[in-house]
Amino acid sequence: MNNKEIGKLGEDFTVEFLSSRGFIVLERNYKVSFGEIDIIARKGDILIFVEVKTRRNLDFGMPVESVSFEKQNRIKKIAEIYVKNKQLRFKEIRFDIMSIILSPKGEVLNWEYLPNAF
């Protein structure tokens, strides 16, 4: 299983997680020239940008630890572009992280959803 496949499994799990909790997924893999946002969703008057980090082991630490300050700032800039381009208005904009650990077979062993992560 390559990194792209691992990432897709994590994103698929996260979309299912969000949908089952009443979120409406608006976009997946929203790209601009300098990066992307994995998932953009809404729930009521809240617009949520979700960074999904998926790993098969903890050799490099917990998945959430790889969302650096630089990565957070890049996501915020992409979010600004998204809101401006779509001309959206929400009472709240939130940045969440989904951290997932997979088994060697690609099954979700552990996950943690962090609302308002940054």
UniProtKB/Swiss-Prot annotation:
The protein's GO terms of the molecular function aspect are:
nucleic acid binding
Pfam families from the UniProt entry:
UPF0102
Q: Which domain of life is it from?
A: Bacteria
InterPro entries, A to Z:
Restrct_endonuc-II-like, tRNA_endonuc-like_dom_sf, UPF0102_YraN-like
Family the entry assigns: Belongs to the UPF0102 family.
What is the protein's given name? UPF0102 protein Dtur_1530
